[in-house]
UniProtKB/Swiss-Prot annotation:
Regulates CDK7, the catalytic subunit of the CDK-activating kinase (CAK) enzymatic complex. CAK activates the cyclin-associated kinases CDK1, CDK2, CDK4 and CDK6 by threonine phosphorylation. CAK complexed to the core-TFIIH basal transcription factor activates RNA polymerase II by serine phosphorylation of the repetitive C-terminal domain (CTD) of its large subunit (POLR2A), allowing its escape from the promoter and elongation of the transcripts. Involved in cell cycle control and in RNA transcription by RNA polymerase II. Its expression and activity are constant throughout the cell cycle. This is Cyclin-H. Keywords: Cell cycle, Cyclin, Nucleus, Phosphoprotein, Transcription, Transcription regulation. One of its GO terms (cellular component) is transcription factor TFIIK complex. Belongs to the cyclin family. Cyclin C subfamily. The modification Phosphoserine is found at S5, S132, S304.
Length: 320
């Protein structure tokens, strides 16, 4: 249960400001570590600023979702949600300048498959990468190298509570206890879209899975012109507890605002920041504390297979 979970105790935070402080601390700690090794000065332009790290994390998190969406065999939604949560948690306390998000995102997906018991072998997993067999083998070596690091940085808190199960639970509840809504399934598509958009934000680090699921359903109802206030007051028994109802409405409003204000990173900005990031991970600077095999760092192309049509129509290196 979520309320007794490590997710509630250790990975649900009070505010966006708290998340910003954690990320800024991770950025500062890495800079201090890099300066201490004598290769750079404190204000060296090679360093990424916290807001630049956030931009890169947004980009690679979207890449992670895209990788999972075309994965063969089809990856369950809970596995995708777990992988994304691992990625978010990892970069609360670590810098992209130390651990490259390209390999971390793959390690998150790989570990999520194991934890959520999605039966896929290591060769099957790397078979989804757009790489030669040798390249896939080397990438797997990297993933296995980083797997224990990832587990340690997650403080061994590997069970993730996603909003997808409570979402299905609310739909069942609407069907059985809320006759005013004749066909709750009409809410599913728009609610699913909301869940996809909220996954790109920090909502999973700020709100409970049931709050996210309920907000998705009520947002869908609102867009369809359906009023469901009576569901909150009658079916969820909040009529007599106006304080709890008011708090819930405030939470849902802030979550919708979080989704509304999310801005995907601009391609030109990402391109410039990726160049800056690669310099941090270059062999001559070697700012990253643990030097890894270089394969997998130089090129984004290996992250997902192309279709045969794409292989014919687009040159290597044009993926996303």
């Amino acid at each position: 249960m979520y309320h007794n979970s490590s997710q509630k105790r250790h990975w649900t935070f009070a505010s966006e400001e708290q998340l910003a402080r954690l990320r800024a601390d991770a950025n500062r700690k890495f800079k201090c570590k890099a300066v201490a090794n004598g290769k750079v000065l404190p204000n060296d332009p090679v360093f990424l600023e916290p807001h630049e790290e956030i931009t890169l994390c947004k980009y690679y998190e979207k890449r992670l979702l895209e990788f999972c969406s075309v994965f063969k065999p089809a990856m369950p939604r809970s596995v995708v949600g777990t992988a994304c949560m691992y990625f978010k948690r990892f970069y609360l306390n670590n810098s992209v300048m130390e651990y490259h998000p390209r390999i971390i995102m793959l390690t998150c997906a790989f570990l999520a498959c194991k934890v959520d018991e999605f039966n896929v072998s290591s060769p099957q997993f790397v078979g989804n990468l757009r790489e030669s067999p040798l390249g896939q083998e080397k990438t797997l070596e990297q993933i296995l190298e980083y797997e224990l690091l990832l587990i340690q940085q997650l403080n061994f808190h590997l069970i993730v509570h996603n909003p997808y199960r409570p979402f299905e639970g609310f739909l069942i509840d609407l069907k059985t206890r809320y006759p005013l809504l004749e066909n709750p399934e009409i809410l599913r598509k728009t609610a699913d879209d909301f869940l996809n958009r909220v996954a790109l934000t920090d909502a999973h680090l700020l709100y409970t899975p049931s709050q996210i699921a309920l907000t998705a359903i009520l947002s869908s109802a609102s867009r369809a012109g359906i009023t469901m206030e009576s569901y909150l007051s009658e079916s969820l028994m909040l009529k007599e507890n106006r304080t709890s109802l008011s708090q819930l409405l405030d939470i849902m409003k802030s979550m919708r605002n979080l989704v509304k204000k999310y801005e995907p990173p601009r391609p030109e900005e990402v391109a410039a920041l990726k160049q800056k990031l690669e310099r941090c991970h270059s062999a001559e600077l070697a700012l990253n504390v643990v030097t890894k095999k270089r394969k997998g760092y130089e090129d984004d192309d290996y992250v997902s297979k192309k279709s045969k049509h794409e292989e014919v129509c687009s040159p290597k290196g044009s993926f996303m």
